[in-house]
């Protein structure tokens, strides 16, 4: 079906899913690449960094983009969707991304925190 043009979707383009103890397992993006290698087609993602989910949240809640902040640890999904959607982005360095990633990324977070506990200082 996919080879014949059937539209298919993925949740996110993440390559690895962090696990307890610092281990990683393949995530949705890895699986999508596997399917692409076989079919020549890559999915349309509706999770981050796609705006679909955030647009739905805005529509359903009535919040304006300037009333929303996205908090995340991945530059290429969490911070990217915030950048596309003109909402505040807060990068936490306790996950995947590093300060070096921020320097080399096309998208930049509005705020960088060492970990999520620092968010209370912003409130």
Residue ranges: model-predicted function:
Residues 1-123:
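Asp-based, Mg2+/Mn2+-dependent phosphohydrolase catalytic module
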